[in-house]
Amino acid sequence: MPKSRKNGNAVYAADAVQKDDRKRKIASGAGVLAIGSVIAKMLGALYRIPLTNILGAQGMGMYQLIFPVYALFMVLSTAGIPTALSRIVAEKRATGQPSKKYFAAAMLALALLGGICSVLTFALAKVFAVWQGNPDTYYGFLVISPAIFLVGIISGFRGFFQGEMYMLPTALSNVIEQVVKLALGITLSYLLIGKGLIWAVCGALLGVVCSELVTLVYMVTTYFVRAVKARKNGVREIRERMTKQEVKSMAAMAFPIAIVAILMPLSNFFDSMIIVNMLRLHGESGDVATAWYGLLSGPVQSLVNMPIVAIISLGVAIVPSVSASRATRDVDSIMLKSRLCVKLCYLLGIPFAFFFAVYADNILSVVYPSLNQNSLNIAANLLKISAFNVVTFSAMQIYVSLLQALDKTKWAVLSLVCAITVKTVLSLVLVRFTGIYGGAIASVSMGALALLISNAAYFKICGLHLEKNVGTNLVIGVIMALSGVGVKALLQNPVAAFCVGSVVCVVVYVWLVFLFGLVSREEIPHLPMKRLMWGLHRLIRFWDYG
């Protein structure tokens, strides 16, 4: 008896060690994926700065007319299959069952969908160009169409590797994709700008195609190297075909994922069809309408997206642990982690929004020196309006992620569908009668409405509001903005005002946040840069440590 008990304890201990190892591997893989995603998104946002300086407002308008159509067909070509594949592979791997048949079926479906979407983009290029109100974009659609097929195949490899808990290829492929696009796209557009604007735009789009091709080569190489190593280690998998039931199950899993994924690209697609045409009805020429659309969707949106990417990356890093807490029905843990996600959005989003509103003209003149004074003035006004999207879009997307983590995807879909519908109607009306600023107002309205609905949905599910102290946070943001206005009035040089104002605003905001206790001692261990947070908390709220 003692011997069997001892053996039982040993087996139990071994199982516990294996579970701990698995958890550590998942956490490590998620960390690698998050880092790669942040780097890739930041590179993607930075890419548009030199591109705008080369293409100018009108060229950027052409580029931004083409890209939403490309993004929409890119989502349609994947249809949620990669995410469904990663889940199925992870499940089969955990139970020791073969998963290659799912990978083969997914790759076949992705190749077919990608091929169809690429051909449709190529065939309908003229139609899209006419609908958008700028016939010159026709050539851009022809150039970008092969990338849709390549993206579909790449996404299949990414889904498979993620299901295998091997996150490095996905993280590296994201970075490779952006680096090649940045280097080649900027180089080609610079070399071709002398031949004409559409040539330079096509050069940038060719850079996108080449980046996807290089990424695909990397993913294929990684897959076969891994397969060869597995064979050398004696790992072989029996080839089987999927049953009809398995195909239906995979499709059912992919469908809701695809619905959520397609909504934002669909909104941008509507913008590309509406804004230029409404501006022309407003009385602007085709070139001016394209240039103004380029200012809104290019330099302005790029600046707004930078803090949104950073904020969402920090917040979403906490979201997987919300799913884990839901599995254990730990309500207190769910509320703590959810509140922290949302608090990060407001703590970081509010100062960025006010800073953009105060220093819009300074930022744009420093970052986009090639824009003429009229374009800078229009872009500055657009940025002052769009600055509020930093708060609403980041918080809205965190709420959507939290709802998905709680298996309430239908509420996420409802909030986005309602918001996109309102934005589309407002764009049709406001841009037609007020000009390009109507497009910015419609975008802000969309973010605000989606945030309100998703917030209400979360309250309905959990019974608690998450965003305490938002009023105090807004007051602190106003004080920070006033200090920025003071610096701007004292320093006439835009570069000096921007640099000094940045430092003053950061110091004032951080000091007031800790002074008013918006970050508690209990929350600091869960925040990024914990040591720095502790140091600032001790320095500013020294009486708490007496």
Task: Outline where the language-model segments fall.
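Membrane-interface helix-loop junctions in multi-pass transport and translocation proteins
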Residues: 168-169, 179-217, 222, 410, ...
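Membrane-proximal transmembrane or re-entrant/amphipathic helices at the cytosolic face
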Residues: 2-13, 489-546
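Interfacial/gating helices of multi-pass transporter permease domains
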Residues: 52-72, 197, 201-205, 245-253, ...
